[in-house]
């Protein structure tokens, strides 16, 4: 059971997890864990499933998925009958009015839909995941000199579950450098998995780029892959002018994570998100929603 904070009704909700029985079996049974290490965490498994989700045969999954998880298709640019395959549906674009952008330059917005955690006064040797598992920022970024620039800064971890909108966006005007890709495995990023596999974010395939924002300084913008995420697709053009809310990219099928790192004294995260993070609870947010303010 995954409990998260709903800031709209100021109460806790229970997340309905796609493939929950499979996740629990894989990460809680000896057979499942052995299968995970031998096969499921490997690129080959995610590629196979990604291949299926790119084929017309997978279209039959769409309506069941929509009904099971009560996905509001009135927000989508296209309806279910217009999608060619499951990945076409999974990476669907939303109507512009579905995700209004807070235009005030001092407001920090969420880069996507999902559940968010926030950490201030970043300790480079110990960043805390869901369930209290720690990992090293040095190991995550694999660049010690760059990592040191973010000592005592702020970290935001946005977890996108399979039922979420899976495109991610820029949080400010600015210019973004080329993407750096780091090889890794494909463990699940669901809290069920995070509690069983130490330092998942450091072990999984991930990509990051430096975003030179106009109002929040230089930000490390990282995307982390997960089980069945066949691809992390970057749609932005490096080293060109970017506007707040512009699309940066998207994930193909699977749960995935966006992580942002800010330098010291650049932002102040909203108190409700910070307080819930300290209690160990994620907060649900949508792309374009205000989550903090410029210092």
Curated annotation (Swiss-Prot):
Binds 1 pyruvoyl group covalently per subunit. The keyword Cell membrane applies. Pathway: Phospholipid metabolism; phosphatidylethanolamine biosynthesis; phosphatidylethanolamine from CDP-diacylglycerol: step 2/2. Its cofactor is pyruvate. Its EC number is 4.1.1.65. The modification Pyruvic acid (Ser) is found at residue 256. Transmembrane segments: none annotated. GO terms for molecular function: phosphatidylserine decarboxylase activity. GO terms for biological process: phosphatidylethanolamine biosynthetic process. The record marks 255-256 as: Cleavage (non-hydrolytic). Heterodimer of a large membrane-associated beta subunit and a small pyruvoyl-containing alpha subunit. Belongs to the phosphatidylserine decarboxylase family. PSD-B subfamily. Prokaryotic type II sub-subfamily. NCBIfam families: PRK00723.1, PS_decarb. Catalyzes the formation of phosphatidylethanolamine (PtdEtn) from phosphatidylserine (PtdSer). HAMAP family: PS_decarb_PSD_B_type2. This is Phosphatidylserine decarboxylase proenzyme. It comes from Clostridium botulinum (strain Hall / ATCC 3502 / NCTC 13319 / Type A). The lineage of its organism: Bacteria, Bacillati, Bacillota, Clostridia, Eubacteriales. The gene is psd.
